[in-house]
Regions:
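Bacterial N-terminal signal peptides that target proteins for export
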Residues: 1-11
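Bacterial N-terminal signal peptides
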Residues: 10-19
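Gly/Pro-rich turn-and-neighbor structural signature
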Residues: 109-111, 115-167
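C-terminal, well-structured catalytic/ligand-binding subdomain of enzymes
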Residues: 25-115, 157-165, 169-414
Length: 414
């Protein structure tokens, strides 16, 4: 089982923001291209417009609690963590290549916070205001704080409706700063835009993708893998942003080609397994896994694992935290448990539904120093997500699912 690794030297702290009450009168509020709502306790932020306008909406609507949470997180780590954070924020700003559209969005977030908070944007632990480089540090957290996750996809004869059903757990080291602060962000593109609209289950100010679905039903999730680090430091892209660009580029009919093209032009620091699910329409398959790292001499950094190259089962694909094509496959109890679940279902003739998919995810939830922050079942054919969230120290496996109509969330704003 993948162990979470921390050190003061590599610590990058994520800025997590929860909603705050607004004291400004309507006459003083700027025009914001976004709205914030709550469904069954989950905050849902919809944004539209230019990248900067989308960023401004995030910063303005999410309120002042982000500064307090960042301060609390840094102080919990002590002076060494604060020093490491400052070093990391400078290094990542100079090392990482950020595409202009994402840079504009991050700058917009900072502008939105300034417009909302004024002098309250100062982070006491840092003794300075929140800046653009803090957004870079936030979006590089997955490069140094590795996560252990589990996913699977079934489709066709294994599902009750003949479509695709995909499950995903995000497991990470428990930190109180992450408790009860997850949000769903819906980024709505204009009709006809080459950039697909998509939703992201995440924490505020992380603009990359950890767990997402786009308007065509394509899903992407991040998983760690022990891959090769790149020797070309001039081309590094935060992997969350590479996954986001993949999802924004992917069309259901050509997802494999679309995602591979993005990943091969965005070199990352670390090894990744990227499970992708897509609507199953009676032929082909409903899943593929992209084994992705900085070894550009092997398949230009990306090896695609499909069912044909994975196992004899023709309607199941499993993904945890080890390669199966880019390197020799290693033993993994979570991987094997999901295969056992599939074998039992096949033997019994029982087709999998959402409740059954969550039961499989429960079987592979991590424990010990890690917890499951969210557990998600995707229905790509119908563009739905079923989301379970952690609450306090209680992980997501114990919560009631929240059903999200992704198609409705992503309709262009009027």
């Amino acid at each position: 089982m993948l162990q979470f690794r921390r050190s003061a030297r590599s610590l990058i702290v994520v800025l997590f923001i929860t909603s705050a009450g607004f004291a400004d009168s309507p006459a003083r509020q700027p025009h914001v291209k976004g709205d914030l709502q709550t469904q069954d306790g989950l905050r849902i932020l919809r944004v539209w417009g230019t990248p900067r306008e989308q960023g401004f909406a995030q910063g303005y609507l999410l309120g002042e609690d982000g500064v307090k949470l960042l301060d609390k997180y840094l102080n919990a780590g002590g002076p060494d963590a604060i020093k490491a954070y400052e070093i990391a924020s400078f290094l990542m700003t100079r090392t990482m290549k950020i595409e202009p559209c994402y840079q504009q969005e991050m700058e917009g977030i900072v502008a939105g916070f300034k417009a909302r908070l004024g002098d309250k944007i100062v982070v006491p632990a840092l003794g300075r205001p929140l800046e653009y480089r803090d957004l870079i540090a936030v979006n590089c957290i997955p490069e140094t704080a590795r996560v252990g996750c589990s996913s699977f996809t079934v489709w066709g004869p294994m599902t009750t409706d003949g479509g695709t059903l995909a499950g995903r757990n995000l497991d990470w080291y428990h930190n109180p700063a992450l408790d009860d602060s997850q949000i769903l962000v819906a980024r709505v593109s204009e009709a006809g835009s080459p950039t697909a609209s998509w939703v992201s289950l995440t924490w505020p100010c992380f603009v990359g993708c950890l767990t997402g679905m786009n308007a065509e039903g394509v899903t992407v999730s991040v998983h760690d893998a022990p891959g090769q680090r790149t020797t070309d430091g001039s081309r590094l892209t935060p992997r969350g942003l590479a996954l986001r660009e993949s999802l924004e580029s992917a069309r259901a009919a050509t997802a494999g080609q679309d995602i591979a093209a993005v990943l091969r032009r965005r070199t990352c620091m670390v090894g990744n397994n990227i499970p992708v699910a897509l609507p199953f329409v009676g032929k082909g398959y409903g899943s593929m896994v992209f084994e992705y790292d900085g070894d550009l001499e092997k398949d230009n950094g990306v090896t695609i694992r499909t069912v044909e190259s994975d196992q004899a089962n023709d309607c199941l694909q499993v993904c945890t935290n080890h390669y199966r094509k880019r390197a020799d496959a290693m033993s993994c109890d979570r991987y094997e448990n999901l295969e056992v679940d599939f074998a039992r279902a096949t033997k019994s003739g029982k087709k999998l539904d959402v409740a059954g998919a969550f039961a499989w995810l429960d079987d592979v939830a991590m424990s010990g120093n890690c917890m499951t922050y969210h557990s998600v079942v995707f229905e790509p054919n119908s563009r739905r997500m079923h989301i379970r969230l952690s609450h306090g120290k209680v992980d997501a496996t114990h919560s009631k699912p929240i059903v999200i109509d992704v198609a409705a969330l992503l309709r262009p704003a009027q």
